[in-house]
């Protein structure tokens, strides 16, 4: 297995001052709703998800959107979380760039990370290169995203994760996939610490500076939210976990992306909030509260934009998830994965207008 090499191209750095990117996702239905509504800023990139180990499987081709011979197909596969096709995401909307969440989890693929490291899935990596050659803009490849999340089986073997990540990068670079930037994304999720009853050192998953163009994390809660369920473990706040990523990024001169951002447990259409999870605040979907738009804004959007402004030196991209989570089987009743709500901006004119103004200020007015 190849390790760090001295001949790799340099990674991006904050000093390169990349433009500030708004990314929208995370499935084709969500993107179509956002784009058709003209409610909000035009994104610089769109989000898609790919199941790496199924890339050559005829049932769904891993959501890649091309078949085994590299030809685009009309199939939009749905894993109960909205229709996906990375090819369509990159070509249907006139937005040239794409952020891809590349799943390497062993939840449905036990033992396959070690096989990836051994070279058993080099054909799947080649198929990624085939797709990327068809994409006119940048590909932000989030390899094994949320590596520290307890829900992602297999990543707990840090060496397997690192070697798998490196093999994918080395292979794509050897195939001259020049439009790819590599994203190392932690979850920064307090609920992971609740599950684990401890806080891991995320640096244990770091594949090395030569393999990372961006660092990233997810943002779903209020920055200073705390659990209302009694727990013996003293939990950090979402802000503290995000700060941990930013500290690493500054130390390693990497730009940062909020790779998944959504107002968890808020419903922008119905103007409500409810419990997310029994391990955090109570039975999922219960304790519903009616809110004003101002309360919704202050409950999630304002803290996120404040965090972006406070860290302008290092955060250069944010990917908003514009989805009706509650209508998707993976996230809807009976809420086995928690209550997520409805984060579609186009269903709430006031929130959409304020979001548009804040994105413009973050991108253009505050430097």
Language model regions located:
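Acidic (Asp/Glu)-rich catalytic clusters
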Residues: 34-41, 81-99, 127-136, 204-210, ...
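Glycoside hydrolase catalytic-domain groove-lining segments
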Residues: 74-90, 94-97, 220-271
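Substrate-binding cleft of extracellular glycoside hydrolase catalytic domains
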Residues: 56-186, 289-295, 342-347, 354, ...
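N-terminal substrate-binding region of glycoside hydrolase catalytic domains
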Residues: 9-121, 230, 263-266, 278-293, ...
